[in-house]
Amino acid sequence: ENARIRNNLADGINFAQGTKNSTVKNSNIRGNGDDGLAIWSSISDGTNAAAEENNKFLNNTIESGWRAAGIGIFGGKGHEISGNLIKDVFAGAGIRVNTVFAGHNFDLNDSGIKIHDNTILRSGTTNDLYNLHRGAIDFQQVRGTIKNVAIYDNKLLNTLAEPVITKNFEMGDNGNGEIRLSNNTIDNK
């Protein structure tokens, strides 16, 4: 709580290897070379870690990341991402939700993940480190399906890439049943 993290070459904070019931709150994360905040439900290196569970990122400012997302969610269950200001992430998405890495991903997500009441300002790119297009919110499914995620009441402002929400699978304007999008404001004036 109330932390300041500046200019490192990796994630600002990464909950991994079975982290449960942990919160980053009222903190400022700036200038990171990977995700500002991340939840990574990994089982890499032959570990038998449990899935990430019930973690929260609340009322933080994440700014000026230069390689990845402001906030990255790579699986687990029961997380809440709320009240964050994510701004000036010029080389990636403001919020990234995906199954790119091996791990528990969203297979055990029976309690749902809520991403709401965040403001994403001047984020996204047409050419990230992997030569991919990332919107203010980006979904990518590689190793399994993203499921039971609700994204609502967020503000996506002055985004740096179109479309504002990017994905590598079929999904309508309101989601696809497993991902629910509602009442998100997009303003690129």
Could you tell me what each predicted segment is?
Residues 7-15, 31-48, 52, 64-73, ...:
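Extracellular beta-strand/beta-solenoid scaffold signature
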Residues 1-10, 19-34, 38-39, 50-66, ...:
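Right-handed parallel beta-helix
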